[in-house]
Amino acid sequence: MEEEVAALVLDNGSGMCKAGFAGDDAPRAVFPSICGGPRHQGVMVGMGQKDSYVGDEAQSKRGILTLKYPIEHGIVTNWDDMEKIWHHTFYNELRVAPEEHPVLLTEAPLNPKVNREKMTQIMFETFNAPAFYVAIQAVLSLYASGRTTGIVLDSGDGVTHTVPIYEGYALPHAILRLDLAGRDLTDYLIKILMERGYSFTTTAEREIRRDIKEKLCYVGLDFEQEMQTASQSSALEKSYELPDGQVITIGNERFRCPEALFQPSLLGLEASGIHETTYNSIMKCDLDIRKDLYGNVVMSGGTTMYSGISDRMQKEITALAPSSMKVKIVAPPERKYSVWIGGSILASLSTFQQMWISKQEYDESGPSIVHRKCF
C-alpha cells in the first residue's frame, strides 16, 4: 500500500500559488500569493478577527488589512509570511497533512543557496514532510512540453527569465533575468488608460485592470503597422463593462500594453526586450548546442498567454539569429500552469522516486543536503 500516497506539488509564484497532487493534470488550488494582517489592533474584541489572512480571503478583506507579497521577483523575501502561505496551502486548500506526503517545491532560476536551505529546513522542521525535493521552475516547464533540451522563456507576474537547458540541466551561466512581467504590464495599462481619461486607484481596480489586460490585450506582429491601423479606423476598438455598469472603450492600448515586453523603454526601463534577452541567453551557450535551443524556444507562465506573442517572437528571433537557423517557438495551450504540470509529471515518475531527500537524510546532513540532491 506504500505507493498510494500522492506527492504534493507546490509552485509558488510572485503573483499566484499553484498547488495540487502529483499525477493530476492540473493544480487543485490556485490563489494569490498574498498575506495580510490587520491594519489596526482589533477594536472589535471577541469578533474572531484572525491575525493573518492568506490568498483570496486576504484579497477580499484588503480594506482592513495591510497586504504583503512574500515572493518578490520570484524569490522568497519574507519567510514568516511564506510559512503562512504554505500552511494555508496544506491545511485549507489541499486539506492534507504534510507529514504524510512527499513535497515537491519549485524555485526561481538563480535562487540563492541560503533560500534553498531555508525552504528545505521549513518543510522538514515545521511541516515534518517525510520527503522533499526542489526543482527549477523553467526546467519543469520544459519537461511539461515533452523536452529535455531547449530554452524556456518563463514570464509570470513578478519576473521573467530565459533559461537554456541541456539534457535536463539548466545552464546557470547563461540564465538571464528581466524584472519586467505581468504586474508591470498591468501598471502600464493603468497609466495608458489614464491618458484616455479613465482613472483607477484602488487595489480592487487593479484586479479589474488585470482582467482587461487578460481579455483584451494582444501582441501586434508589427507595432508601427498596428499603431497606424488604430489611428485610421476603429476596427481595433473593444469595449469593456466595469462592475458598476460603466463601459470603457480601449483601442491601441490593447497592443501598446504587451508591446512593453519587446520594448521595455516604453516603461522607462533600460533593458532588452524578451526577444533580445532570449537571443542573448542563447549566445552565452556553447556553439554546439545553439541549434537545439533555437529550435526549442518554449514559452511558459501567464504573461506569455497573449495572442500573437509566438508569431512575434518567431519574427524577432529569426531576425536576430543566423540566417540559416531554424527557429521554432513552442507555446503549449496550458502554459499558464506548465511549471506545475511539469512538477506533477516529475514527482509521479517511478525513476524519480530515488531522488527525494528523505527525512532521515535531512536529519543526518542538515539543510545543505539540498545542494547535493537537487540540481
Swiss-Prot record:
Its main location: cytoplasm. It is found in: Cytoplasm, Cytoskeleton. InterPro entries: Actin, Actin/actin-like_CS, Actin_CS, ATPase_NBD. It catalyses: ATP + H2O = ADP + phosphate + H(+). PROSITE patterns: ACTINS_1, ACTINS_2, ACTINS_ACT_LIKE. Keywords: ATP-binding, Cytoplasm, Cytoskeleton, Hydrolase, Nucleotide-binding. One of its GO terms (molecular function) is hydrolase activity. Its EC number is 3.6.4.-. It holds the Pfam family Actin. GO terms for cellular component: cytoplasm; cytoskeleton. The keyword Hydrolase applies. CDD domains: ASKHA_NBD_actin. It is an enzyme of class 3 (hydrolase). Actins are highly conserved proteins that are involved in various types of cell motility and are ubiquitously expressed in all eukaryotic cells. Belongs to the actin family. This is Actin. It comes from Puccinia graminis (Black stem rust fungus).
